[in-house]
Design a protein with these regions (language model features):
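Conserved P-loop NTPase catalytic core
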Residues: 252-283
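Walker A/P-loop
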Residues: 87-108
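N-terminal accessory segments
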Residues: 1-88
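Conserved nucleotide-state-sensing and coupling region of NTP-binding domains
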Residues: 124-189
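Glycine-rich phosphate-binding loop of nucleotide-binding enzymes
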Residues: 92, 108-125
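Substrate-engagement module of ASCE P-loop NTPases
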Residues: 222-240
Length: 283
């Protein structure tokens, strides 16, 4: 199977061909070669990683067909750049039921952790319970996903001390290979969050805001202060993905949208004035 980037015209087909080749290698008694193929083909390709290792999470429960849209490929392209030396910050705005949590709390951090592109993930949600539920899904894959356990034992086995897991709780997991995942509510005390001397190198915020019925402009301002003063300063060199849905006018996600629209309008005005310079803004 030839190497292909996630921009392959049909990543679902490519993943299927990889799995067929893996089955052939297993049938020939070449288990190590099968594992090496999976690892090598997914090293730089988050979408392919999800299709190979987390296929059931991308399968429609009614049709039993694997589903993948252009937006999922765009999200995978964002994550692929986490492997570079230059950190990036992105705000992703999407309606509900688009798979935001599946990709940003499971598939993309799992890919980054498996291939060493992230060593310490700090994940935040509106409440501690939400964040912990996502970490539980992540840990269930580590415990029960046969392919992950075969190919990435240093990720799937918890770090042990005196015969007991060092950190395998509702809000924290530390792997044998020293990867760490911490899940917190937005208003949980987060100042100075670090493990030994390590600070988060990937910060994910998913649905950081509650629904409009329990949210006000004052609360939005308070939550923005938490984001700017407590969460982002955990590591200014970390990759950051802030994912959410616009819950009301003036919410944090809505402010991202307005800022983006203003920058696009400014670029258009520059073109109208004959300027040759157009500035693009990464949220």
């Amino acid at each position: 199977v030839s190497r292909a980037r996630m921009t392959s015209p049909d990543p679902i087909d490519l993943a299927g061909r990889i799995l067929e080749k893996v089955a052939e290698l297993h049938a020939a008694g070449k288990k190590d070669a099968a594992a090496a193929l999976r690892v090598e083909m997914t090293r730089d390709d988050p979408a392919l990683f999800a299709l190979v290792y987390l296929r059931r999470h991308l399968t429609d429960t009614e049709t039993q067909r694997v589903t993948l849209s252009e937006v999922h490929l765009a999200w995978a392209e964002i994550a692929r750049q986490w492997a570079s030396s230059e950190p990036r910050r992105d705000a992703i705005i999407a309606p509900r039921s688009m798979g935001k949590s599946t990709w940003f709390f499971l598939a993309l951090p799992m890919w980054a952790a498996a291939h060493g592109h992230a060593r310490f993930v700090a994940a935040f949600a509106n409440s501690a319970g939400q964040a912990q539920a996502h970490l539980m899904t992540f840990k269930r894959e580590l415990d029960g996903n046969r392919l992950l356990r075969e190919d990435y034992p240093g990720l799937t086995r918890p770090m042990m001390r005196r015969g007991r897991p060092l950190a395998d709780s509702q809000d924290m997991y530390i792997a044998e290979g020293r990867f760490a995942f911490v899940a917190r509510g937005a208003d949980t005390g987060n100042l100075g969050l670090k493990i030994d001397d390590a600070r988060p190198d990937l910060i994910v915020c998913d649905d950081l805001e509650p629904g409009e019925g329990s949210y006000s402009a004052y609360q939005a301002e308070q939550r923005l202060t938490t984001l700017l003063d407590d969460i982002l300063p955990l590591n200014f060199r970390a990759n950051v993905a802030i994912v959410g849905t616009t819950v009301m006018s003036g919410s944090i996600i809505d402010q991202f949208r307005k800022y983006h629209d203003e920058q696009e309008a400014a670029a258009v005005r520059n073109l109208d004035c004959g300027s040759s310079h157009v500035e693009t803004v990464a949220l």
